[in-house]
Amino acid sequence: MEASAQQPRRLVLGGLHHVTLIVKDVRRSVDFYRNVLGLRLVKQTVNEDDRSARHLFFGDEEGRPGTMITCLEYPQLDEGTVGVGSTHHVAFSVGSDEELEGWRAYLESRDVQCTEVLDRTYFRSVYLRDPDGHILELATAGPGMTVDEPLEQLGQRAVG
């Protein structure tokens, strides 16, 4: 077969579609993600790969990809350990420093323990845990990745 002279179409990822967490009790997850964080419970179904596991989808009002976090219920599983192959945290975007401060005050009023606002150079954030111990982050968009290097040089500076 003759090789094509055309360059193959460039493959581009469009961002995250969703993140799935393993939880012990979906009722606690509904209480937290819907009633505390304000996400819409978009879908209640079962895991396509294990129909014994309930699968809940939370997201924005339209359930758009990129806004969703899903929970698979496995009440019989033990708590996991942090290590290679595990995920450290999931970050949600908030619009501004003022919104981040508002979220922090609101979470504390709901007895959700969270960190002080942390300056991460490229954004500011607050960390908290969901009822199953997953680390969640609320993060601002700015000041952005170009705060210490120009756009055209992003990712070229050596680390360490």
Regions found by a protein language model. Name each.
Residues E2-A3, L13-G14, V23-R27, E48, ...:
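Vicinal oxygen chelate
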Residues A5-P8, P75-T81:
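Short beta-strand/turn micro-motifs at beta-sheet edges
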Residues Q6, G14-L21, L39-R40:
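The feature marks the first
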Residues L16, L39, L56, G66-I69, ...:
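Short, structured motif recognition centered on aromatic/hydrophobic residues
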Residues I22-P65, D119:
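Core segments of cupin and vicinal oxygen chelate
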Residues D60-G63, P75, G95, P131:
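Short loop segments at secondary-structure junctions
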Residues T67-E73, A141-L151:
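Short, basic, helix/turn surface patches
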Residues E73-Y74, L118:
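A conserved beta-strand-loop-helix scaffold within acyl/acetyltransferase catalytic domains
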